UniProtKB/Swiss-Prot annotation:
Its EC number is 5.4.2.10. It comes from the Bacteria. This is Phosphoglucosamine mutase. The lineage of its organism: Bacteria, Pseudomonadati, Myxococcota, Myxococcia, Myxococcales. It comes from Myxococcus xanthus (strain DK1622). The active site is at S109. HAMAP family: GlmM_B. Belongs to the phosphohexose mutase family. GO terms for cellular component: cytosol.
Length: 458
């Protein structure tokens, strides 16, 4: 663990909780315990016993962090319900249904097994706002609650919840229209050897589908390894080989969804949003004729939904910011190109399995193959390049990079756009070029990526 002065200058929370290499600061047992104590301090009010739901994905380091987080919570007099491996949205759902004070997820989502993370949900099932995360960070760094030590009967207890998985499966099935069935459909589902390895196949089978399951043999080290939402190639091959109706790809914590049509073509979050927007408009269920996406979404999404008189509100990257925009303005559909899809009429956060069920409902009602439904979305060519960096700075502090960006913007004119941003969860900068000429996009992206590499290599 770095010295206290280094820790003080290092922000714990990113765009999706605290994340890093397992057993390396800040993803250590010590920090996990401190996070638990800080969360417990914030929720302690009134004479009643307080409870926090704690779940995880299938990473090896989850055992270590689960115990440390639970120790921190119980040491402050808060009870803990340990649900074991369960999708992130499942933990959010259990938190609200159990009327718990908060929920905690131990996961690094789509990252490799060497990483891990901790993120929190409030009692209403929504992720903590930035201000609350800031309070937790201040409590951890200041040491101001170190002396608070409940004793004897005031110490919290930890329990194992044995039926959490079943509760979540029942919830998911209830979001699928009762009059519909998946009988006669063959569905390939890739669970990324992650948190949904038992829930997603079960839901689809119980609704009547013939299921071919991939990525359902987690060993603690193979989560997201050449499988799941980031690696749909094997899924696509399996769909075509078995003549399946579609393929469903989830990531390690199952909060995102990418699908593959019956021809093996990938259908991303933008296309899924376009399809579901059309369905909600037709059923007069899309609130205020608005869809929420992020700056990463393709301009083709706006063009696709414009035919129904729907407008798109864009936010910064991160499903939490999509949800914030939806709640603030009373919208009920939003998501990200990466596959975080939020159906606010059903849930409070991105849920890959739930989103798949909503898409399947559209397919059942339309009686059309996914490839035909997805044809309403025509993306403008995009190039996305990830640049590994050793440090992150404001782009305005990088004159050589800004010069290249402005040059590219001038050459693109009004025929495309440039987006350069730092990842909130990884040591990477992301360069997105959108324009009608794919080859030109690649060349422009490389120019900017090279400039970033030179400027941030030390």
């Amino acid at each position: 663990m770095p010295p206290k002065e280094a820790q003080a200058s290092q922000k714990l929370f990113g765009t999706d909780g605290v994340r890093g290499k397992a057993n390396v600061y800040p993803m250590t047992a010590e920090v996990a315990m401190q996070l638990g104590r800080a969360l417990a301090f914030l929720i302690r009010n009134g004479p009643h016993r307080h409870r926090v739901i704690v779940g995880k994905d299938t990473r090896l380091s989850g055992y270590m962090l689960e115990q440390a987080l639970a120790s921190g919570l119980t040491s402050m007099g808060v009870d803990v319900e340990l649900v074991g491996p369960l999708p992130t949205p499942g933990i959010s759902n259990i938190t609200t249904s159990m009327r718990a004070d908060a929920g905690a997820v131990i996961s690094a989502s789509h990252n490799p097994y060497e990483d891990n993370g901790i993120k929190f949900f409030w009692r209403d099932g929504f992720k903590l706002p930035d201000e609350t995360e800031g309070k937790i960070e201040e409590l951890v760094s200041s040491g101001s609650i170190d002396s608070i030590r409940p004793t004897a009967t005031k110490i919290g207890r930890a329990f194992r919840m044995e039926d959490a998985r079943g509760r979540y499966i029942v919830f998911l099935k209830a979001t699928f229209p009762r009059e519909l069935t998946l009988e006669g459909m063959t569905i390939v589902v890739d669970c990324a050897n992650g948190a949904a390895y038992k829930t997603a196949p079960a839901v689809l089978e119980e609704l009547g589908a013939k299921v071919i399951a991939l990525g359902v043999s987690p060993d603690g080290k193979n989560i997201n390894h050449k499988c799941g939402a980031l690696y749909p190639e094997n899924l696509a091959k399996t769909v075509v080989k078995h003549g399946a109706h579609l393929g469903i790809a989830l990531d390690g914590d199952a909060d995102r969804l990418i699908v593959v049509d019956e021809k093996g073509k990938v259908v991303d979050g933008d296309a899924i949003m376009a399809i579901c927007t059309g369905e909600l408009v037709a059923r007069k269920q899309l609130k205020k004729k608005m869809l929420v996406s992020t700056v990463m979404s393709n301009i083709g999404l706006e063009r696709a939904v414009a035919r129904w008189g729907v407008k798109v509100a864009r936010t910064r990257v991160g499903d939490r910011y999509v949800v914030d925009e939806m709640r603030r303005n009373g919208y009920n559909l939003g998501g990200e190109q990466s596959g975080h899809l939020i159906f606010l009429d059903h849930t409070t956060t991105g849920d890959g399995t739930l989103a798949a069920l909503q898409l399947l409902a559209v397919m059942c009602r339309a009686g059309k193959p996914l490839s035909e439904l997805a044809s309403i979305f025509e993306p403008v060519p995009q190039t996305l390049v990830n640049v590994v960096v050793k440090q992150k700075k404001e782009l305005g502090e990088l004159p050589t990079v800004m010069k290249v960006i402005k040059s590219v913007e001038q050459r693109l004119g009004n025929t495309g756009r440039v987006l350069v941003r730092f990842s909130g969860t990884e040591p990477k900068a992301r360069v997105l070029i959108e324009g009608e000429d794919a080859a030109r996009n690649q060349a422009y992206a490389k120019e900017i990526a090279d400039a970033l590499s030179k400027a941030l290599s030390v």
